Amino acid sequence: MAKKIHNIEGVQLGTASSHTRYGDKEDSLIITLPKTAQVSCKFTSNKLKAAPVQLAINNLSSYSSGAKAFLINAGNANAATGQQGMKNVKSYCKAIASELNLKEENVIPFSTGVIGEALPVNNYLSAFQEANTKLSPKNWAKAANAILTTDTRPKIISKKITIGKQTFSITGFAKGSGMIRPDFATLLSFVFIDAKINRRSLNKMHAEALDCSFNAITVDGDTSPNDSSALVANGNEAKLVETNSKAEKKIAQCVKGIFKELAELLIEDAEGATKKIKISVNKANNLQQAKSVAFTVAESPLVKTAMFGSDANWGRILSAIGRDRTIDTIENVQIKVNDVPLVKKGNIDPKYSEAKASRAMKKKEILIQIILNTGKTEFEVLTSDLSEDYVLINSDYRS
């Protein structure tokens, strides 16, 4: 949780409980945006797109005045729920739009939770109506808590940057512990900027931030049907950011930093995780190869269980590299763990020390360095280990 949370002018948040899956815990969030806001949204690549994702995409592509409110519920994904699922999400969006004096297309829904269960629409509608009466510019911590499912703690980052004579606030929060392989996981992310930025620049900023953050993490290799990320600029006229200006570049860097920190918080709170693992691929032939190898190693159950058991089983890492579809030969591959040499030229490194390797593997943060020696490109992926707790959490998730 951020030590100090900076409010974003014109953005208000309200939370309430639907009294469904999580009892009295607040699980419903409404966020209202100023009329001047610009919004960039990115959604799951999963072909099974949840009803709220489908409606969000449709609403954002309409020729209305743009997104002016977000409705987010936790506990029910409203995915694989057919026509009734779409009717349900449309019904509460329409009702809340009326209360906010907005067009239906101005309301953008997001959901996270169990797939394939009918949405208790009346419960969530009542929760959103209650949340609407509790709107406040200060409810950031409550908002970050309301969207959680299997997460054990909220993830929120807030920063201020000064550029020239102006100070810009940027605040964001996210959720996600399992079904994390963005391409975005059961992952929801909302980041807000106190500035006026045009939509094209905002979209570019968003895409670049995703590439080095949520699109560079994995817990279990599964991509949710509900993945959604929103980047909002509130349209503050006093803080106009010109395209390609120094201010835009600095804000973009800060946004990237916030996205990366949120992604790291997701990995630290991954389901059942005891370790945070960075897979760094260097000297790859191209970005495709670097990404492919990094994710192949990061998503290997054998590698992940070895990390959990603090087992310096370098053969599992080398084997994962060897099966990657972009690799022609492993003859030049080098592998290190926390700078301890494991593999050189595709075989055990002559400098290998079992004692040093074992000590390295016992650390809570592990860096696996893979040098392919096929080119000059590099890429990093963050992941977690695979423990018994992950299995327990996911074996009775619906209960």
PLM ranges: what are they?
Residues 1-73, 77-90, 94-399:
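A structural signal for small-residue-enriched, beta-sheet-centric alpha/beta enzyme cores
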